[in-house]
Regions:
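Conserved catalytic alpha/beta core of Sir2/sirtuin-type deacylases, generalized to analogous enzyme cores
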Residues: 1-131
Length: 131
């Protein structure tokens, strides 16, 4: 929901580029990466603090939640709406709800499974169990 770092998008012309095309500017030259097409700033395809979540992204997430059997909240306090409300929507529709988070959340008492631990430690163990 909050994006990924595999691509960057020009904030002026909305052209999408692979992240490796912008990595040199940021990592080696410590420059703001610019769009080769229009000169606009290239931004990673993530939602930055204070940015609005695109309606399309939220609607897609809600559609997926309505069809899921299990939802896992990983490393989230679940305090920021509207994304923080998605696990409760899934739970209300019959999905199993798992929380993996270092600290407690308001939803701990509603979850089917709660693991209070660092996700860096827990996720490799879960992945190994499915390997």
């Amino acid at each position: 929901v909050h994006g990924h770092l595999r691509e960057s998008t020009c904030i002026r012309c909305y052209t999408i580029y692979p992240a490796d095309a912008t990595a040199d500017a940021v990592l080696e030259r410590e420059e703001v990466p610019l769009c080769p097409s229009c000169g606009g700033v290239l931004k990673p395809n993530i939602i930055m603090f204070g940015e609005m979540l695109p309606v399309r992204v939220l609607n897609n997430a809600k559609r997926e939640v309505r069809n899921c059997d299990v939802i896992i909240a990983i490393g989230s306090s679940l305090e920021v709406a509207p994304v923080g409300d998605l696990p409760m929507l899934a739970k209300s529709l019959g999905a199993k709800f798992i929380i993996i988070n270092l600290g407690q959340t308001y939803a701990d008492s509603f979850a089917d499974v709660v693991i209070h631990a660092d996700v860096v430690d827990v996720l490799p163990k879960i992945a190994a169990a499915f390997a």
